[in-house]
């Protein structure tokens, strides 16, 4: 057939890679998409950079992590004595059917602006209650019917993300097809006697808060799932190279450096991290007799032996014998931030096969 032009080959290569990533088309995210700090922390953890976050538990059975911001048409719920409540709805329809969700967390940041009403040396606490809405409020019943999912006691000075397990609700919506009416997040303010006080806590965007600071602190729903391909996300143990002193032929089969730069293929607008990675490749001769370090099979040894007396039979080939995964943080077609483990992306060892 006719030779393909380089740009056609590149387009075909891009389509194959997108298919490998489970994407139907190349994502084209807007310039103002914000990557939640939690997702960056999770990526750093799984890329082997140590962190002091308890992120390991939820991700240990998952190979895909997705984050969702709530739909910002916030429904105010009537404030009762000493309580602040908000409804948060997260649209989860972009989770693929083949993905099995194993757990879900609701991340809330009751940040510094929340606590300005309190004296710095006082010992006030808030209780944060997370409810699933079973039936939304109606004209006749002003309050929604809810079910408590999680509750936690938070000191008013604690400026950190609070994570609540909302797995039962998300599984009901996704796996069992129940209607998703969202969550109610209720903050109960407790004074020194642990009775409810009327101090106000903000869990939604303030009137004058700029887009950038709000986007860093807005609530986040994080789902952990597995698409049935490859291994779960986990901290990658750095392999210790086995340095045995052995005589190697200069041209014998071995691993060579190969760095894949996502900038070169113009993908750095939707791949958040890493900017590229060391894929390596295998190249070199498989000479007769095959040395032990060439990591050969019995079949390769027999084939090489036959080749030494009959050159019509090809030599064994230098190929990857061990491959490892990489973690990638990227924006999908719906501008959702996804962390995923991709199998067989890095050559760890080569041999004659």
Swiss-Prot record:
Gene3D superfamilies recorded: 2.60.120.970, Cystine-knot cytokines (2.10.90.10)
A GO term from the CC aspect: extracellular space
Subcellular location: Secreted
Chief localization: secreted
Pfam short name (any one): TGF_beta
Chain intervals with Basic residues compositional bias: 231-248
Residue ranges of the propeptide: 1-239
GO molecular function, one term: cytokine activity
Any one of the GO BP annotations: cardiac epithelial to mesenchymal transition
Annotated stretches, region: Disordered: 228-248
Sugar attachment sites: 91, 121, 157, 295
InterPro entries, sorted: BMP2_TGF_beta-like, Cystine-knot_cytokine, TGF-b_C, TGF-b_propeptide, TGF-beta-rel, TGFb_CS
Taxonomy, superkingdom: Eukaryota
Key words of the record: Chondrogenesis, Cleavage on pair of basic residues, Cytokine, Developmental protein, Differentiation, Disulfide bond, Glycoprotein, Growth factor, Osteogenesis, Secreted
Cystine connections: 253-318, 282-350, 286-352
Assembly: Homodimer; disulfide-linked.
Similarity-based family: Belongs to the TGF-beta family.
PANTHER family: BONE MORPHOGENETIC PROTEIN 2, TGF-BETA FAMILY
Function: Negatively regulates the structure and function of the limb apical ectodermal ridge.
Protein name in UniProt: Bone morphogenetic protein 2
Organismal lineage: Eukaryota, Metazoa, Chordata, Craniata, Vertebrata
